[in-house]
């Protein structure tokens, strides 16, 4: 009987200990809101992914330091998709299945984000894309939002700016025929520029990974364009700009938010260059922007590009929705997000019926400041 009693006591003790363990886990889980993050932290656009993750982390740190959201702490679980759609899917599945995230910020590029939108919609996971500008990203359904403006708007901005601010009458375009981002920008630049009375005198293309653009640039040079539109990411644009200037093409070059970071990857060849962006970091007087930029510089030792600001805004969009709805449930938050009407680092923001943000774009000019390049505010273009 004593042996039975001892065994009984031991079993009860074990059950009690296990129960306490699970109670602790449950309490910890209940006090924490997991936010999944999918970013290209390595690969060709790693600088963008790292900046975006930094912005997300900084916002979460600020919110947690202020007491969290409705008494809950936010936790980022970040995954690297290397800029690969296939790896984006793997990262998404890991975050949802293993980490039990029902809110995800990501991915960064349009191709990687498009690979996971249908999964998120089917599984009722709230997906907030910080920088995927491809127009059909949110077509997957009402669980998919984005914080950035879309390619049609960016392309239109480039066309209007070239006509109205630069006074261009004709333009040449050199774009990546294998990249949806580049194609979308080119197509919408063309529409806006031609509808505004301009003429496209050259439309040349290349393939992803190409390094030599001299053949296309030779054709462009013969047309003597007033402006050259380069809708691609900073690494490729830096290569094109160097070859373009070497050929004696001195026309202004214009691009989009994929240029962000170009000043660290190019030289004087990108002077007389202009690009659309989500905010002006260096010379803004907006209190939210100034505070964000100063905090980022203090934390990371560098000036934040727009992808950091977009990641930062994603977290505050979610925070505001959580507070207003008094919920962290994805189904509730998606409804609350549609009611957004607030001021953020990248501008005053509401969502349209496709869950795309309605907000202005700024055009930045690359200038020489002493011995370094810097982007400065040039113009604002409203929706």
Predicted regions and their residues:
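Segments of small-molecule ligand-sensing domains
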Residues: 298-308, 319-373
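Extracytoplasmic "Venus flytrap"
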Residues: 36-55, 79-86, 108-109, 174-183, ...
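Hydrophobic alpha-helical segments within soluble ligand-binding/sensing domains
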Residues: 88, 147-170, 183-185, 212-214, ...
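Beta-alpha junction/loop-to-helix N-cap segments that form part of ligand/metal-binding clefts
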Residues: 27-29, 47-52, 66-138, 206-213, ...
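Short, low-complexity disordered leader/linker segments with a strong preference
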Residues: 1-34, 65, 380-383
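Extracellular/periplasmic periplasmic-binding protein-like sensory domains
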Residues: 241-312, 366-367, 373-382
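Extracellular/periplasmic bilobed ligand-binding domains
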Residues: 186-277
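An alpha-beta-alpha
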Residues: 144-205, 227, 318
């Amino acid at each position: 009987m004593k042996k039975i009693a001892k065994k009984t006591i031991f079993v009860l003790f074990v059950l009690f200990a296990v129960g306490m363990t699970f109670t602790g886990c449950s309490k910890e889980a209940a006090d924490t809101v997991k936010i999944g993050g999918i970013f290209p932290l390595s690969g060709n656009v790693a600088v963008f992914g790292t900046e975006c993750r930094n912005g997300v982390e900084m916002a979460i740190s600020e919110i947690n330091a202020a007491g969290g959201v409705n008494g809950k702490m936010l936790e980022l679980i970040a995954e690297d998709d290397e800029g690969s759609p296939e790896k984006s899917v793997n990262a998404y599945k890991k975050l949802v299945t293993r980490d039990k995230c029902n809110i995800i910020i990501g991915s960064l590029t349009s191709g990687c984000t498009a690979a996971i939108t249908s999964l998120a919609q089917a599984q009722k996971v709230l997906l907030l894309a910080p920088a995927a500008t491809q127009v059909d990203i949110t077509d997957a359904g009402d669980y998919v939002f984005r914080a950035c403006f879309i390619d049609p708007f960016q392309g239109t901005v480039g066309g209007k700016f070239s006509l109205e601010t630069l006074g261009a009458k004709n333009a040449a375009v050199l774009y990546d025929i294998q990249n949806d981002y580049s194609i979308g920008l080119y197509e919408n630049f063309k529409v806006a520029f031609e509808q505004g009375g301009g003429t496209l005198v050259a439309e040349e293309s290349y393939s992803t990974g190409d390094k030599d653009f001299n053949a296309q640039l030779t054709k462009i040079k013969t047309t003597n364009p007033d402006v050259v539109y380069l809708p691609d990411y900073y690494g490729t644009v830096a290569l094109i700009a160097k070859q373009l200037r070497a050929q004696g093409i001195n026309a202004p070059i214009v691009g989009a938010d994929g240029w962000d970071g170009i000043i660290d990857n190019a030289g004087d060849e990108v002077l007389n260059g202009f690009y659309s962006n989500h905010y002006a970091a260096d010379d803004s007087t907006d209190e939210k922007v100034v505070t964000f930029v100063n905090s980022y510089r203090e934390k990371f030792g560098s000036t934040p590009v727009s992808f950091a600001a977009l990641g930062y805004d994603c977290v505050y969009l979610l925070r505001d929705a959580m507070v207003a709805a008094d919920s962290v449930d994805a189904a509730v938050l998606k409804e609350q997000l549609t009611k957004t009407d607030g001021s953020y680092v990248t501008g005053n923001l509401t969502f349209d019926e496709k869950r795309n943000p309605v907000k202005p774009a700024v055009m930045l000019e690359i200038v020489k400041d002493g011995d370094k390049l810097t982007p400065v505010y040039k113009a604002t273009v409203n929706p």
